[in-house]
Amino acid sequence: MSQARPATLRVAVLGAGSWGTALAAAASRRHPTVLWARDGAQAQAMAARHENTRYLPGVALPPALQVSADLAQALAHLAHDPAHALIILGVPVAGMTPLCTELAARLPALGLQAVPLVWTCKGFEEQTAHLPHETVQAALGAMPGLAAGVLSGPSFAREVAQGLPVALTVASESSAVRDAVTTALHGAAVRIYASTDVVGVEVGGALKNVIAVACGICDGLALGTNARAALITRGLAEMARFGAALGAQQETFAGLTGLGDLVLTATGELSRNRRVGLEIGAGRKLADILASGMTAEGVRCARAARDRARALNIELPITEAVCAVLFEGLSPMTAVSALLAREARPESPTP
């Protein structure tokens, strides 16, 4: 780290879904932490029961964790010592623009515009095909002193909330962001690695969800572990090609936020993206799966990833196949056959 930070930070986690709650729980074990929930009833129930029954039922939250539905109160927690504070955005991609727009109005008024800020969402914004850092830049880029980055890696929220071991990467051009996240979370069961490759970390986090849907489809069709291994490996090549076109560092894709996150999401039993793929492979329609309440970022961002890749003339055959199955009525087996029928070529895991 570039310089020592104090042992104690004030942390505000904005967004009380499963991942926001898990990170707030981890931070609150060592630092004064406030978790902001947009839903007042949810916040009240969490504060009373020390449990997020909606997103992490059965997981006890640390008694020291404060929960509030008042965004002003959550930010005021930081204003007591803005030089030693951290903001973690725990909302999904779809919630980034509204929240960042609100923060653009609130942070300068409280003197918090230079507080290190990280987001944790993975994917592309459906309407714009923006990666999260582009959304943040559009909403907060004019704010003086902005220091921002992304926190990502192979992690299921439930395990993090339970205090089980996890390794994550914080990526930012700002050493203040990297240092603040490390101070807030590194230690005990959480290991933090630092990077400057924001784009590479985000591309890995976005595309691994799409590849995980493909792996779930493969498993749902009972095509075997050989086929799954091929999808993971060639999916990693797609991630690297896409990242290279956007200026990412290739070594990022061999790390936690590339290969690590892809393997976890493509094979883990807690992976929602894999579960959606399993259902598709078993013959269920996407509309029925979504109507049952199952959600997955891979479904939300697949089309945006495909469209942005096409605009950049990047070949993403697995992503194209997933989109054809999800949105164009192509049968899963036909998609597999089309992938297998592609022309033979030399293996090139990197661009």
From Swiss-Prot:
One of its GO terms (biological process) is glycerol-3-phosphate catabolic process. Gene3D superfamilies: N-(1-d-carboxylethyl)-l-norvaline Dehydrogenase, domain 2 (1.10.1040.10), NAD(P)-binding Rossmann-like Domain (3.40.50.720). It comes from the Bacteria. NADPH binds at residues 18-19, 38, 122, 157, 272, 297. GO terms for molecular function: glycerol-3-phosphate dehydrogenase [NAD(P)+] activity; NAD binding. Keywords: Cytoplasm, Lipid biosynthesis, Lipid metabolism, NAD, NADP, Nucleotide-binding, Oxidoreductase, Phospholipid biosynthesis, Phospholipid metabolism. Catalyzes the reduction of the glycolytic intermediate dihydroxyacetone phosphate (DHAP) to sn-glycerol 3-phosphate (G3P), the key precursor for phospholipid synthesis. HAMAP family: NAD_Glyc3P_dehydrog. NCBIfam families: PRK00094.1-2, PRK00094.1-4. This is Glycerol-3-phosphate dehydrogenase [NAD(P)+]. It comes from Bordetella parapertussis (strain 12822 / ATCC BAA-587 / NCTC 13253). The gene is gpsA.
